């Protein structure tokens, strides 16, 4: 089950994305000829494909938890569950095509994500960039967590699932690919990391392979 050549980006909210985000999205699309590219905007989600999703309905109608980050966390999981492909934050500047990543995967890989080394020397997983085959095990397990922790999920739930279930179908890439602060020979995107979206990763499993 291979990860399809589809790039998903999202912009939710009632304002248009800033010019630089729009430009990065256009660069992403131009860099991937032959790929399907989709920028999902507010109406596409809330008045379209996921208008009946109970969690999104509650997020957007509950003033105490009206947070775009909660919504975005769920939306990107839903998109990869239903379509497969690669999710990339809209504020990520593309440097090299994601063909580089797909060429490193084998037929067993149904999910990939990237890590970032922190100043405290912990290894962290971020969710600004990740990819999955349609209806993948990891994505479905993350979505199942919403039943109990719909107000406290984010990338922590996402990261914990990867840690606990990391196996032959999961590929992890080191920080050079998605979360380097400067250009390097492996840089795929440059992204402004938000530390609150990062989580510790236990590297105690000798079977874990990291590029």
Language-model features and meaning:
Residues 73-85:
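Small-residue hinge/turn detector
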């Amino acid at each position: 089950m291979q990860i399809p050549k589809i790039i998903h980006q999202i912009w939710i909210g009632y304002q248009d994305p800033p010019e630089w985000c729009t430009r990065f999205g256009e660069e992403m699309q131009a860099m991937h000829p032959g790929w399907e590219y989709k920028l999902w905007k507010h109406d596409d989600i809330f008045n379209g494909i996921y208008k009946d999703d109970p969690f999104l309905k509650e997020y957007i109608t509950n003033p105490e938890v009206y947070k775009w980050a909660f919504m975005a966390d769920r939306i990107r999981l839903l998109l990869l569950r239903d379509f497969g492909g690669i999710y990339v934050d809209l504020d990520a500047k593309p440097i090299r095509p994601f063909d580089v990543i797909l060429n490193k995967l084998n037929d067993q890989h149904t999910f990939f994500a990237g890590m970032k080394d922190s100043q405290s020397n912990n290894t962290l997983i971020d969710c600004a960039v990740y990819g999955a085959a349609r209806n993948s095990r990891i994505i479905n397990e993350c979505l199942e967590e919403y039943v109990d922790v719909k107000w406290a999920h984010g990338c922590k739930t996402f990261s914990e699932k990867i840690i606990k279930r990391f196996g032959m179908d999961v590929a992890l890439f080191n920080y050079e690919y998605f979360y380097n602060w400067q250009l390097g020979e492996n840089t795929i995107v440059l992204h402004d990391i938000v530390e609150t979206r990062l989580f510790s990763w236990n590297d105690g499993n000798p079977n874990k392979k990291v590029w």
